[in-house]
Protein backbone atom coordinates (compact mmCIF):
# COMPACT_ATOMS: atom_id res chain seq x y z
CA UNK A 1 0.00 0.00 0.00
CA UNK A 2 1.29 3.48 -0.92
CA UNK A 3 0.92 6.45 1.38
CA UNK A 4 0.68 10.13 0.52
CA UNK A 5 2.82 12.69 2.34
CA UNK A 6 0.70 15.21 4.23
CA UNK A 7 1.91 18.77 3.64
CA UNK A 8 -0.82 20.88 5.29
CA UNK A 9 -4.30 20.41 6.70
CA UNK A 10 -6.86 22.23 8.85
CA UNK A 11 -6.06 20.10 11.93
CA UNK A 12 -9.20 19.59 14.05
CA UNK A 13 -10.78 22.97 13.23
CA UNK A 14 -13.89 21.49 11.62
CA UNK A 15 -14.14 18.23 13.56
CA UNK A 16 -17.38 17.30 15.30
CA UNK A 17 -20.93 18.53 14.89
CA UNK A 18 -20.81 21.88 16.67
CA UNK A 19 -20.62 24.74 14.17
CA UNK A 20 -20.17 27.46 16.80
CA UNK A 21 -17.29 25.57 18.41
CA UNK A 22 -15.58 25.11 15.02
CA UNK A 23 -15.80 28.84 14.35
CA UNK A 24 -14.28 29.48 17.80
CA UNK A 25 -11.34 27.13 17.09
CA UNK A 26 -10.83 28.75 13.69
CA UNK A 27 -10.77 32.22 15.23
CA UNK A 28 -8.23 31.15 17.87
CA UNK A 29 -5.90 29.67 15.26
CA UNK A 30 -6.19 32.79 13.13
CA UNK A 31 -5.20 34.93 16.16
CA UNK A 32 -2.18 32.69 16.79
CA UNK A 33 -1.14 33.14 13.16
CA UNK A 34 -1.53 36.92 13.28
CA UNK A 35 0.46 37.22 16.52
CA UNK A 36 3.35 35.27 15.01
CA UNK A 37 3.48 37.21 11.75
CA UNK A 38 4.58 40.68 10.71
CA UNK A 39 2.04 40.70 7.87
CA UNK A 40 -1.26 42.52 8.34
CA UNK A 41 -3.91 39.83 7.74
CA UNK A 42 -7.51 40.84 6.93
CA UNK A 43 -9.69 40.26 9.97
CA UNK A 44 -11.93 37.20 9.71
CA UNK A 45 -15.56 38.12 9.19
CA UNK A 46 -18.01 36.66 11.71
CA UNK A 47 -21.23 34.90 10.85
CA UNK A 48 -24.54 36.38 12.02
CA UNK A 49 -25.12 33.08 13.80
CA UNK A 50 -21.84 33.43 15.69
CA UNK A 51 -22.54 36.99 16.79
CA UNK A 52 -25.93 35.96 18.21
CA UNK A 53 -24.70 32.60 19.61
CA UNK A 54 -27.18 30.80 17.38
CA UNK A 55 -30.21 32.61 18.81
CA UNK A 56 -31.40 33.85 15.39
CA UNK A 57 -33.74 31.60 13.35
CA UNK A 58 -31.84 28.74 11.73
CA UNK A 59 -34.21 27.68 8.99
CA UNK A 60 -31.28 27.05 6.66
CA UNK A 61 -28.19 26.24 8.70
CA UNK A 62 -28.07 23.39 11.22
CA UNK A 63 -25.64 24.35 13.98
CA UNK A 64 -25.31 20.66 14.95
CA UNK A 65 -24.26 19.49 11.50
CA UNK A 66 -20.66 18.90 10.36
CA UNK A 67 -19.01 21.74 8.45
CA UNK A 68 -18.26 20.32 4.99
CA UNK A 69 -16.44 21.89 2.05
CA UNK A 70 -18.69 21.77 -1.01
CA UNK A 71 -16.39 23.48 -3.54
CA UNK A 72 -12.60 23.66 -3.62
CA UNK A 73 -10.50 25.51 -6.20
CA UNK A 74 -6.85 26.43 -6.67
CA UNK A 75 -5.67 29.85 -7.72
CA UNK A 76 -4.14 29.86 -11.20
CA UNK A 77 -0.62 30.21 -9.76
CA UNK A 78 -1.04 27.44 -7.19
CA UNK A 79 -0.34 29.72 -4.21
CA UNK A 80 -3.77 29.66 -2.60
CA UNK A 81 -7.10 27.86 -2.31
CA UNK A 82 -10.70 29.04 -2.29
CA UNK A 83 -13.09 26.83 -0.34
CA UNK A 84 -16.87 27.17 -0.05
CA UNK A 85 -18.50 25.44 2.93
CA UNK A 86 -22.01 24.49 3.98
CA UNK A 87 -21.84 26.97 6.89
CA UNK A 88 -22.22 29.68 4.17
CA UNK A 89 -18.54 30.54 4.62
CA UNK A 90 -16.12 31.36 1.81
CA UNK A 91 -12.51 30.88 2.91
CA UNK A 92 -9.27 31.79 1.13
CA UNK A 93 -6.11 29.97 2.18
CA UNK A 94 -2.53 30.97 1.38
CA UNK A 95 -0.24 27.95 1.42
CA UNK A 96 2.17 28.35 4.36
CA UNK A 97 5.90 28.47 3.72
CA UNK A 98 6.61 25.74 6.29
CA UNK A 99 5.31 22.23 5.69
CA UNK A 100 3.31 20.71 8.52
CA UNK A 101 1.72 24.07 9.32
CA UNK A 102 -2.03 24.11 9.84
CA UNK A 103 -4.17 25.67 7.13
CA UNK A 104 -5.69 28.86 8.54
CA UNK A 105 -7.86 31.18 6.43
CA UNK A 106 -6.09 34.22 5.03
CA UNK A 107 -9.58 35.61 4.63
CA UNK A 108 -13.12 34.50 5.50
CA UNK A 109 -16.55 35.92 4.80
CA UNK A 110 -20.09 34.57 5.00
CA UNK A 111 -22.96 34.74 2.56
CA UNK A 112 -26.51 35.27 3.78
CA UNK A 113 -27.82 32.17 2.02
CA UNK A 114 -26.53 28.76 0.90
CA UNK A 115 -24.97 28.44 -2.53
CA UNK A 116 -26.47 25.97 -4.98
CA UNK A 117 -23.27 26.24 -7.02
CA UNK A 118 -20.32 28.57 -7.40
CA UNK A 119 -17.14 28.98 -9.44
CA UNK A 120 -14.07 31.20 -9.26
CA UNK A 121 -12.56 33.14 -12.15
CA UNK A 122 -9.92 31.06 -13.99
CA UNK A 123 -7.32 33.84 -13.53
CA UNK A 124 -7.91 34.32 -9.79
CA UNK A 125 -4.85 34.87 -7.59
CA UNK A 126 -4.23 36.80 -4.39
CA UNK A 127 -1.08 38.10 -6.10
CA UNK A 128 -2.81 39.62 -9.14
CA UNK A 129 -1.91 43.25 -9.81
CA UNK A 130 -5.59 43.97 -10.42
CA UNK A 131 -8.71 42.66 -8.68
CA UNK A 132 -10.61 42.32 -11.97
CA UNK A 133 -10.17 38.53 -11.94
CA UNK A 134 -10.40 38.07 -8.17
CA UNK A 135 -14.10 37.25 -8.26
CA UNK A 136 -16.45 34.30 -7.90
CA UNK A 137 -19.98 33.55 -9.07
CA UNK A 138 -22.62 32.07 -6.77
CA UNK A 139 -26.16 30.92 -7.44
CA UNK A 140 -28.90 30.45 -4.84
CA UNK A 141 -32.58 29.60 -4.91
CA UNK A 142 -34.95 32.54 -5.55
CA UNK A 143 -32.07 34.96 -6.08
CA UNK A 144 -30.12 36.35 -9.05
CA UNK A 145 -26.65 34.97 -9.74
CA UNK A 146 -24.19 37.06 -7.73
CA UNK A 147 -20.67 38.21 -8.59
CA UNK A 148 -18.64 38.39 -5.37
CA UNK A 149 -15.23 39.88 -4.66
CA UNK A 150 -12.31 37.68 -3.62
CA UNK A 151 -10.00 40.67 -3.35
CA UNK A 152 -7.71 40.55 -0.31
CA UNK A 153 -8.55 44.24 0.17
CA UNK A 154 -12.36 43.95 0.13
CA UNK A 155 -13.99 44.90 3.43
CA UNK A 156 -17.59 44.30 2.41
CA UNK A 157 -18.95 41.36 0.47
CA UNK A 158 -22.16 42.59 -0.99
CA UNK A 159 -22.54 41.46 -4.62
CA UNK A 160 -20.48 43.47 -7.08
CA UNK A 161 -23.05 42.67 -9.75
CA UNK A 162 -26.14 40.47 -10.20
CA UNK A 163 -27.42 38.52 -13.19
CA UNK A 164 -31.09 37.96 -13.94
CA UNK A 165 -32.49 34.43 -13.64
CA UNK A 166 -36.11 35.39 -14.33
CA UNK A 167 -37.90 33.14 -16.82
CA UNK A 168 -39.42 35.49 -19.41
CA UNK A 169 -42.33 33.10 -20.04
CA UNK A 170 -43.66 32.88 -16.48
CA UNK A 171 -41.66 35.62 -14.67
CA UNK A 172 -40.43 33.14 -12.06
CA UNK A 173 -36.90 32.88 -10.73
CA UNK A 174 -35.07 29.88 -12.17
CA UNK A 175 -32.58 28.05 -9.98
CA UNK A 176 -29.16 27.80 -11.59
CA UNK A 177 -27.82 24.41 -10.48
CA UNK A 178 -24.41 24.66 -12.16
CA UNK A 179 -22.02 27.47 -13.07
CA UNK A 180 -18.82 27.61 -15.12
CA UNK A 181 -16.76 30.38 -16.66
CA UNK A 182 -16.83 29.94 -20.43
CA UNK A 183 -14.08 32.51 -21.06
CA UNK A 184 -12.51 35.35 -19.14
CA UNK A 185 -15.52 37.65 -19.46
CA UNK A 186 -18.44 35.23 -19.71
CA UNK A 187 -19.99 32.22 -18.02
CA UNK A 188 -22.52 29.43 -18.45
CA UNK A 189 -25.34 28.51 -16.08
CA UNK A 190 -27.38 25.32 -16.12
CA UNK A 191 -30.96 25.05 -14.94
CA UNK A 192 -33.99 22.76 -15.23
CA UNK A 193 -35.49 21.42 -18.46
CA UNK A 194 -31.95 20.88 -19.74
CA UNK A 195 -31.47 24.60 -20.35
CA UNK A 196 -28.06 26.26 -20.60
CA UNK A 197 -27.92 30.04 -20.22
CA UNK A 198 -24.93 32.15 -21.35
CA UNK A 199 -23.98 35.47 -19.74
CA UNK A 200 -21.47 38.24 -20.30
CA UNK A 201 -19.99 39.46 -17.02
CA UNK A 202 -20.79 43.05 -17.96
CA UNK A 203 -24.51 42.58 -18.66
CA UNK A 204 -27.35 41.72 -16.31
CA UNK A 205 -29.48 39.75 -18.76
CA UNK A 206 -28.46 36.52 -20.53
CA UNK A 207 -27.01 36.85 -24.02
CA UNK A 208 -28.52 33.54 -25.17
CA UNK A 209 -30.05 30.30 -23.92
CA UNK A 210 -30.68 26.86 -25.40
CA UNK A 211 -32.17 23.57 -24.24
CA UNK A 212 -31.37 20.03 -25.22
CA UNK A 213 -34.65 18.65 -26.53
CA UNK A 214 -37.56 19.50 -28.75
CA UNK A 215 -40.60 18.53 -26.67
CA UNK A 216 -41.69 19.83 -23.25
CA UNK A 217 -41.11 17.57 -20.27
CA UNK A 218 -43.51 17.27 -17.34
CA UNK A 219 -43.59 15.63 -13.94
CA UNK A 220 -40.61 13.57 -12.81
CA UNK A 221 -38.91 13.84 -16.20
CA UNK A 222 -38.94 17.63 -16.00
CA UNK A 223 -37.65 17.68 -12.41
CA UNK A 224 -34.70 15.44 -13.25
CA UNK A 225 -33.89 17.24 -16.53
CA UNK A 226 -31.43 19.52 -14.76
CA UNK A 227 -27.99 20.57 -15.98
CA UNK A 228 -25.95 19.21 -13.06
CA UNK A 229 -22.40 20.07 -14.17
CA UNK A 230 -20.15 21.39 -16.92
CA UNK A 231 -16.76 20.10 -17.99
CA UNK A 232 -13.63 21.85 -16.70
CA UNK A 233 -11.83 23.16 -19.79
CA UNK A 234 -8.05 23.52 -19.79
CA UNK A 235 -8.44 26.27 -22.40
CA UNK A 236 -10.57 29.12 -21.08
CA UNK A 237 -11.26 30.33 -24.63
CA UNK A 238 -12.59 26.98 -25.91
CA UNK A 239 -15.67 27.27 -28.14
CA UNK A 240 -16.85 23.74 -27.34
CA UNK A 241 -18.14 22.88 -23.88
CA UNK A 242 -19.93 19.91 -22.37
CA UNK A 243 -22.69 19.44 -19.81
CA UNK A 244 -24.18 16.55 -17.84
CA UNK A 245 -27.64 16.21 -16.30
CA UNK A 246 -29.38 14.42 -13.43
CA UNK A 247 -31.05 12.22 -16.07
CA UNK A 248 -27.56 11.08 -17.13
CA UNK A 249 -27.81 12.93 -20.45
CA UNK A 250 -24.61 14.45 -21.86
CA UNK A 251 -24.62 17.41 -24.26
CA UNK A 252 -22.05 19.26 -26.29
CA UNK A 253 -22.37 23.05 -26.25
CA UNK A 254 -21.21 24.99 -29.30
CA UNK A 255 -20.64 28.57 -28.16
CA UNK A 256 -20.53 29.73 -31.79
CA UNK A 257 -23.91 28.35 -32.90
CA UNK A 258 -25.38 28.71 -29.37
CA UNK A 259 -26.83 25.21 -29.52
CA UNK A 260 -26.80 22.04 -27.44
CA UNK A 261 -26.02 18.79 -29.22
CA UNK A 262 -27.10 15.46 -27.73
CA UNK A 263 -24.18 13.07 -27.16
CA UNK A 264 -25.25 10.33 -24.74
CA UNK A 265 -27.95 9.25 -22.30
CA UNK A 266 -28.77 6.48 -19.84
CA UNK A 267 -29.49 4.02 -22.64
CA UNK A 268 -26.29 4.61 -24.61
CA UNK A 269 -24.31 4.56 -21.36
CA UNK A 270 -26.00 1.24 -20.49
CA UNK A 271 -26.93 2.48 -17.02
CA UNK A 272 -29.38 1.03 -14.54
CA UNK A 273 -32.47 3.00 -13.62
CA UNK A 274 -31.18 3.93 -10.15
CA UNK A 275 -28.19 5.86 -11.48
CA UNK A 276 -28.88 9.36 -10.23
CA UNK A 277 -27.10 11.78 -12.45
CA UNK A 278 -23.79 13.03 -13.78
CA UNK A 279 -21.66 14.67 -11.08
CA UNK A 280 -18.51 15.48 -13.08
CA UNK A 281 -17.11 15.41 -16.62
CA UNK A 282 -13.33 15.07 -17.04
CA UNK A 283 -11.45 14.99 -20.34
CA UNK A 284 -8.17 13.19 -20.80
CA UNK A 285 -5.36 15.66 -21.46
CA UNK A 286 -5.24 14.63 -25.13
CA UNK A 287 -9.02 15.32 -25.37
CA UNK A 288 -9.66 11.85 -26.84
CA UNK A 289 -11.66 10.47 -23.90
CA UNK A 290 -14.38 11.80 -21.61
CA UNK A 291 -14.61 10.32 -18.10
CA UNK A 292 -18.12 10.47 -16.63
CA UNK A 293 -18.50 10.33 -12.83
CA UNK A 294 -22.03 9.67 -11.58
CA UNK A 295 -23.87 9.63 -8.28
CA UNK A 296 -25.28 6.31 -6.97
CA UNK A 297 -22.83 4.37 -9.11
CA UNK A 298 -19.80 2.10 -8.75
CA UNK A 299 -18.28 2.82 -12.16
CA UNK A 300 -16.73 5.68 -14.12
CA UNK A 301 -17.79 5.61 -17.78
CA UNK A 302 -15.24 6.23 -20.53
CA UNK A 303 -16.52 7.79 -23.77
CA UNK A 304 -14.51 8.13 -26.99
CA UNK A 305 -14.70 11.77 -28.14
CA UNK A 306 -13.37 10.75 -31.58
CA UNK A 307 -16.17 8.24 -32.12
CA UNK A 308 -19.40 10.17 -31.41
CA UNK A 309 -18.82 9.80 -27.66
CA UNK A 310 -19.53 6.08 -27.73
CA UNK A 311 -18.98 4.27 -24.45
CA UNK A 312 -15.85 2.13 -24.78
CA UNK A 313 -14.88 1.27 -21.21
CA UNK A 314 -15.65 1.44 -17.51
CA UNK A 315 -13.40 2.05 -14.53
CA UNK A 316 -14.58 0.05 -11.53
CA UNK A 317 -14.57 1.63 -8.08
CA UNK A 318 -13.99 -0.25 -4.83
CA UNK A 319 -17.00 1.51 -3.33
CA UNK A 320 -20.34 2.89 -4.44
CA UNK A 321 -20.71 6.65 -4.82
CA UNK A 322 -23.93 7.61 -3.04
CA UNK A 323 -26.08 10.73 -3.12
CA UNK A 324 -23.26 12.88 -1.70
CA UNK A 325 -21.07 13.93 -4.62
CA UNK A 326 -17.46 12.87 -4.94
CA UNK A 327 -15.30 15.11 -7.15
CA UNK A 328 -12.21 13.68 -8.85
CA UNK A 329 -9.26 15.33 -10.60
CA UNK A 330 -7.30 14.52 -13.76
CA UNK A 331 -3.94 15.80 -14.98
CA UNK A 332 -1.02 14.65 -17.10
CA UNK A 333 1.27 13.80 -14.16
CA UNK A 334 -1.12 11.88 -11.91
CA UNK A 335 -3.74 10.61 -14.33
CA UNK A 336 -7.16 10.23 -12.69
CA UNK A 337 -7.47 10.50 -8.89
CA UNK A 338 -10.62 9.96 -6.84
CA UNK A 339 -11.21 9.73 -3.08
CA UNK A 340 -13.02 6.88 -1.34
CA UNK A 341 -15.47 6.54 1.55
CA UNK A 342 -12.74 5.24 3.86
CA UNK A 343 -10.07 7.90 3.40
CA UNK A 344 -8.09 6.41 0.52
CA UNK A 345 -7.17 7.82 -2.91
CA UNK A 346 -7.48 5.68 -6.04
CA UNK A 347 -5.24 6.39 -9.03
CA UNK A 348 -5.46 5.38 -12.68
CA UNK A 349 -2.08 6.28 -14.16
CA UNK A 350 -1.77 8.91 -16.89
CA UNK A 351 -0.58 6.44 -19.53
CA UNK A 352 -3.76 4.47 -18.90
CA UNK A 353 -6.13 7.46 -18.78
CA UNK A 354 -4.77 8.86 -22.05
CA UNK A 355 -5.64 5.52 -23.72
CA UNK A 356 -9.23 5.32 -22.51
CA UNK A 357 -8.52 3.37 -19.34
CA UNK A 358 -6.26 0.79 -20.97
CA UNK A 359 -2.53 0.43 -20.60
CA UNK A 360 -1.06 1.01 -24.07
CA UNK A 361 -0.14 -1.94 -26.27
CA UNK A 362 3.41 -3.24 -25.85
CA UNK A 363 5.58 -5.48 -28.06
CA UNK A 364 4.91 -8.27 -25.56
CA UNK A 365 1.12 -8.15 -25.86
CA UNK A 366 -2.17 -6.26 -26.31
CA UNK A 367 -3.49 -3.37 -24.26
CA UNK A 368 -4.32 -4.31 -20.68
CA UNK A 369 -7.55 -3.72 -18.77
CA UNK A 370 -8.55 -0.83 -16.53
CA UNK A 371 -7.58 -1.94 -13.02
CA UNK A 372 -6.63 0.73 -10.48
CA UNK A 373 -2.92 1.56 -10.78
CA UNK A 374 -2.35 2.50 -7.13
CA UNK A 375 -4.25 2.89 -3.87
CA UNK A 376 -2.94 5.56 -1.49
CA UNK A 377 -3.50 5.62 2.27
CA UNK A 378 -4.02 9.02 3.91
CA UNK A 379 -4.29 10.34 7.47
CA UNK A 380 -8.07 10.54 7.12
CA UNK A 381 -9.14 6.91 7.49
CA UNK A 382 -12.80 6.71 8.44
CA UNK A 383 -13.71 9.92 6.58
CA UNK A 384 -14.82 10.20 2.99
CA UNK A 385 -12.54 12.15 0.69
CA UNK A 386 -15.17 14.00 -1.27
CA UNK A 387 -13.09 16.46 -3.34
CA UNK A 388 -9.64 16.26 -4.95
CA UNK A 389 -7.97 19.01 -7.00
CA UNK A 390 -4.42 19.01 -8.40
CA UNK A 391 -2.37 22.20 -8.29
CA UNK A 392 -2.05 23.94 -11.69
CA UNK A 393 1.55 24.93 -10.94
CA UNK A 394 2.72 21.69 -9.29
CA UNK A 395 0.44 18.70 -10.00
CA UNK A 396 2.26 16.62 -7.37
CA UNK A 397 0.41 18.74 -4.79
CA UNK A 398 -3.19 17.59 -4.37
CA UNK A 399 -5.72 19.59 -2.35
CA UNK A 400 -8.72 17.80 -0.95
CA UNK A 401 -11.70 17.86 1.35
CA UNK A 402 -12.59 15.13 3.82
CA UNK A 403 -15.84 14.78 5.75
CA UNK A 404 -18.28 12.32 7.30
CA UNK A 405 -21.33 11.13 5.42
CA UNK A 406 -23.64 14.12 5.85
CA UNK A 407 -26.62 11.77 6.05
CA UNK A 408 -25.25 9.83 9.07
CA UNK A 409 -25.31 10.99 12.71
CA UNK A 410 -21.68 10.40 13.69
CA UNK A 411 -20.76 12.73 16.55
CA UNK A 412 -17.05 11.91 16.18
CA UNK A 413 -17.21 13.33 12.65
CA UNK A 414 -13.93 14.60 11.21
CA UNK A 415 -13.96 17.26 8.50
CA UNK A 416 -11.48 19.60 6.90
CA UNK A 417 -9.10 20.38 4.07
CA UNK A 418 -5.68 19.00 3.26
CA UNK A 419 -2.82 19.33 0.81
CA UNK A 420 -0.79 16.17 0.17
CA UNK A 421 2.21 15.32 -1.99
CA UNK A 422 1.91 12.28 -4.23
Curated annotation (Swiss-Prot):
- Primary location class: nucleus
Q: List the disulfide bonds.
A: none
Q: Does the keyword Nucleus apply?
A: yes
Q: Where in the cell is it found?
A: Nucleus
What SUPFAM superfamilies does the database record attribute to this sequence? Quinoprotein alcohol dehydrogenase-like
- Gene Ontology CC: nucleus
In which domain of life is the source organism classified?
Eukaryota
Query: Its GO biological process terms?
Result: mRNA processing; RNA splicing
Keywords in UniProt for this one? mRNA processing, mRNA splicing, Nucleus
Q: Specify whether Cytoplasm is a keyword of the entry.
A: no
Can you state the subunit structure given in the record? Answer: Associates with snRNPs.
Q: What family does the Swiss-Prot or TrEMBL record give for this protein?
A: Belongs to the SWT21 family.
What is this protein for, i.e. what is its function? Involved in mRNA splicing. Helps to stabilize the U1 snRNP-5' splice site interaction.
PANTHER family (alphabetical): TELOMERASE CAJAL BODY PROTEIN 1
Protein's UniProt name = Protein SWT21
Amino acid sequence: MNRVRKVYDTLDTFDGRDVLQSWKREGSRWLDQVENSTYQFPELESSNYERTKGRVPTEHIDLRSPIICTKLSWSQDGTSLVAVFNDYGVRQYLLPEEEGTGLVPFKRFFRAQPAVDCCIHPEYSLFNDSDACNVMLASSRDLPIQLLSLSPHAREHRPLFSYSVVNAENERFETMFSLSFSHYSGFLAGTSRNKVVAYDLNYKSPIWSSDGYGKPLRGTSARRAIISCFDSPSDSESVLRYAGTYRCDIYGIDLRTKELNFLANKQTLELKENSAGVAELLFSVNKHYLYVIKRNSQTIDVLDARSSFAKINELYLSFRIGSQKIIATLDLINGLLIGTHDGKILQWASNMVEFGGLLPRTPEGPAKDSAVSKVFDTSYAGSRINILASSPSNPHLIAGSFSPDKFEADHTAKSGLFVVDL
